[in-house]
Design a protein with these regions (language model features):
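Substrate/ligand-engaging "lid" and interaction regions
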Residues: 1-214
Length: 214
């Protein structure tokens, strides 16, 4: 019996070379690095941040799948601009070439555009409280950019969309909305992001316009 398996053309294989003794084997598609941490963070702040940003912005626009969300110019532009901000951070902190980062972002977005491997936005956006965490994909780069003197307006706009995620079948979304109703967005965001209510990021998020439904 044969089984057809659908796979993605996108993959990334970065290998920590510090533990390899002798010559490094030549394997197509493998990148050997002495310190894998910058590449891990590049993946987290591009693939994870981008995927989730598309989901939250798409949900706010009333769209069902990642593929459909990326066909909406408002979602695509919002996610792309947020990734430009994380790209700036990656270039500054880890020394990545800006042009290489741009090409990497394009490959990642092309992966998400694949209609044959498209996720439901509600699945990708699940667990919004965790994703609002201080060390997570949106708040962490936003705080670090602010420490650099940058204003992460596009990441802030995505965080505003996270606050609006109210899918009734997601336990964290239900808790988030209950907290917002009881305490307001400012206190809820500060609590879940682990920052003070008067932190400039809180103000920047709340100044962002709520995404208009498509």
């Amino acid at each position: 019996m044969s089984v057809d398996v659908l796979v993605e053309p996108f993959y990334e294989w970065v290998v920590d070379a510090s533990g390899i003794k002798g010559a490094r084997p030549e394997i197509s598609g493998v990148t050997y690095v002495d310190d894998p941490m910058p590449y891990i963070e590049r993946k987290l702040l591009t693939v994870n941040t981008g995927h989730s940003a598309i989901a939250y912005l798409g949900y706010a626009r009333g769209l069902d799948t990642i593929h459909a969300a990326l066909e909406d110019p408002a979602v695509r532009d919002g996610a792309s601009e947020a990734l430009e901000e994380t790209g700036l951070l990656l270039a500054r902190e880890h020394g990545f070439d800006p042009e290489e980062l741009r090409e990497y972002r394009q490959r990642v977005l092309a992966r998400f555009e694949n209609p044959r491997i498209s996720d439901e936005v509600t699945r990708v956006a699940r667990a919004p409280i965790r994703k609002l965490g201080r060390d997570e994909r949106f708040v962490s780069p936003a705080l670090r950019l602010m420490e650099m003197g940058r204003e992460p307006r596009h990441l802030a706009a995505v965080i505003r969309a996270v606050l609006g995620f109210d899918h009734p079948q997601d336990a964290e979304a239900v808790e988030l909305q209950e907290t917002i109703r009881a305490e307001g967005e400012r206190r809820a965001l500060a609590r879940y992001a682990g920052i003070e209510e008067d932190h400039p990021l809180v103000g920047l998020v709340l100044e962002s316009s709520e995404p208009a439904r498509g």
